[in-house]
Design a protein with these regions (language model features):
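C-terminal, structured domain-capping segment
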Residues: 24-56, 125-181
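Short, isolated positions within intrinsically disordered regulatory regions of eukaryotic proteins
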Residues: 18, 111, 125-129
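A surface/secretory-pathway sequence property marking extracellular, secreted
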Residues: 7-10, 56-121
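Conserved small/polar residues in nucleotide/adenosyl-binding loops
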Residues: 1-5
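Short beta-strand segments of immunoglobulin-like
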Residues: 19-23
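N-terminal edge beta-strand
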Residues: 9, 14-17
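Low-complexity, polar-biased intrinsically disordered regions enriched in Pro/Ser/Thr/Gly
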Residues: 16-17, 66, 148-150
């Protein structure tokens, strides 16, 4: 429950994780749940917008080939396999998002921009949020890209930056959806 006098961004599941659980490695999925809260003590509902900035880098990546059939053979009738890594882009470095996420229902993508260093998304929640209420998380987890070991220096920070903007619905009376604001 929100109890302050403003909008706030929380990540309840992420905040519960010990630091060692937040360490990423290729293919790892970790809980991360940016949630917007209308913490205003007034009676005004607010439209909530989340901006998410994902780091990008020019690296080599790989895909796990899932070719195994139920009988243990693969589609090429070679030795049984449980999946093998196949280099993407012919093994050449290419610019990729270092993490990915799947937005939850109720959030609409308003804008998306990419540079060599970042991929930025702006999402709006589908309706105004009453004081003391919160949105469901924009997403529940993030997955680190399958980056070839050594392509990023060990200890490279993979910061996912989330920013919240709230607009009181009383000041945009003509708006019926967050996209109208």
């Amino acid at each position: 429950m929100c109890i302050r006098d403003r909008a706030e961004l929380t990540e309840p599941e992420w905040d519960k994780l010990p630091d060692e659980a937040k360490v990423l490695y290729p293919g790892k999925t970790v809980a991360k749940d940016p949630t917007a809260c209308n913490a205003a003590e007034s009676t005004t509902a607010a439209y909530m917008y989340l901006q998410v900035e994902i780091p990008r880098a020019s690296v080599r990546t790989y895909t796990i080939a899932e070719t195994a059939k139920a009988d243990g053979s693969d589609e090429t009738n070679q030795e049984p396999t449980s999946g093998a890594g196949v280099l993407d882009n012919g093994g050449e470095p290419h610019t990729v998002d270092l993490v990915s996420f799947q937005p939850n229902d109720g959030w609409s993508l308003l804008e998306e921009t990419e540079t060599e260093e970042t991929h930025t998304f702006i999402y709006a929640y589908e309706s105004a949020i009453a004081p003391g209420a919160q949105t469901p998380p924009l997403f529940d987890c993030v997955t680190y890209a399958n980056v070839v070991e050594g392509d990023l220096p060990q200890g490279t920070a993979v910061d996912i930056i989330c920013r919240l903007t709230a607009i009181q619905s009383d000041y945009v009376a003509d708006a019926n959806t967050p996209q109208d604001v």
